[in-house]
Amino acid sequence: MRRFFWLVAAALLLAGCAGEKGIVEKEGYQLDTRRQAQAAYPRIKVLVIHYTADDFDSSLATLTDKQVSSHYLVPAVPPRYNGKPRIWQLVPEQELAWHAGISAWRGATRLNDTSIGIELENRGWQKSAGVKYFAPFEPAQIQALIPLAKDIIARYHIKPENVVAHADIAPQRKDDPGPLFPWQQLAQQGIGAWPDAQRVNFYLAGRAPHTPVDTASLLELLARYGYDVKPDMTPREQRRVIMAFQMHFRPTLYNGEADAETQAIAEALLEKYGQD
């Protein structure tokens, strides 16, 4: 009788634990998750914005291939269900996606390990008479992107300066999302970095915006902000870094030339967000 009593009591105790919040039943064992320790560092630190340079169906096929992937794909005009735009999640956030490639930002490399990638359906650019013409982004696509990006930033406490373009982290290889991506609009929504106009004017110090400045001095500022700048860069490679910065923060002119306005923007950003 006593043995029966203890068996019943043990069964009731186990049943209570099984239904208790924070107790997870596994095959052959039970997990108590009610006490959580602080991780050494959060894995996700960077949010990377891309464009697909293709239509939606082709983009979806490419991003579900074995060679390349992204966590999210946002259609140019997202279909709406129950009044909300639909976004495709292709890789769970806790898993790595192959979206960044060879990349570097703020001293870190292998950014696939520490980032979430969002691909935007967009045709990219077409070249005519030696000039690249970038495709605009649909307003509905940007409106769908905003709550997704806000969600990700809030979950992982991503800093504004770590919301970046693919071109920012791989300027020698990539242009996306290009100069028509509305970085300033997103910054007004709390997504990403943007310089204060008054501070840009302060650092411009009365110079004409396109006054040439020393390239090495500008690159030193960009390196402090987070760009991958190496001492043995060719002039073309130097221009690619400057152009990536300009497409993000001065999209009206992104010729890769070192000028006073680009320098002033870099100084204003460093003042506002700190350096690498």
Swiss-Prot record:
Substrate binds at residues 51-52. It is found in: Cell outer membrane. Its cofactor is Zn(2+). The record marks 174 as: Transition state stabilizer. One of its GO terms (biological process) is cell wall organization. Residues 1-16 form the signal peptide. Coiled coil: none annotated. The keyword Signal applies. It holds the Pfam family Amidase_2. It is an enzyme of class 3 (hydrolase). SUPFAM superfamilies: N-acetylmuramoyl-L-alanine amidase-like, PGBD-like. Residues 42-179 form the N-acetylmuramoyl-L-alanine amidase domain. Its EC number is 3.5.1.28. It catalyses: Hydrolyzes the link between N-acetylmuramoyl residues and L-amino acid residues in certain cell-wall glycopeptides. This is N-acetylmuramoyl-L-alanine amidase AmiD. It comes from Escherichia coli (strain K12). The lineage of its organism: Bacteria, Pseudomonadati, Pseudomonadota, Gammaproteobacteria, Enterobacterales.
